[in-house]
């Protein structure tokens, strides 16, 4: 279970995964891959966070978005890409990769994993870093139309 925290004191910890891992017969929480938009598309944008992907897909006229739970949450990503039959993956990860070395390292590892998939063309979508996420950037474009 993933819960959004609205704690101004910990702005860097927006979401928490809940589990019963420490309880008798408990289980850990598992990250999952969220897919939104036109699943017939041969191009998929890859980003972090299901809500961000839903918003970005809507703002990009139903573009296909594959959304991981976090930059280190890669379980199931390659299988999802293969299962959708996409030919192109466009990285749309948050711009904090430019300033946070830990995020950058995780994004590079993710990129290497996706690039191992045969037949996939991989590119990176870039925008003005004043907009942290692809959803923020697309919303700014929609607001000026």
Q: Regions from the language model: what does each represent?
A:
Residues 123-132:
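Acidic carboxylate-rich catalytic motifs and surrounding loops in phosphoryl-/glycosyl-chemistry enzymes
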Residues 64, 88, 121:
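Residues at the starts of beta-strands that form the adenosine-phosphate
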Residues 52, 73, 106, 110, ...:
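Short phosphate-engaging motifs
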Residues 1-85:
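Phosphate-handling DNA/RNA-contact segment within nucleic-acid enzymes
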Residues 101-117:
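Short, aromatic/basic amphipathic alpha-helical patches
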Residues 46, 87-102, 125-126:
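Acidic beta-strand-to-loop metal/phosphate-binding motif
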Residues 136-145:
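Short, small/acidic-rich helices and loops at N termini and domain boundaries
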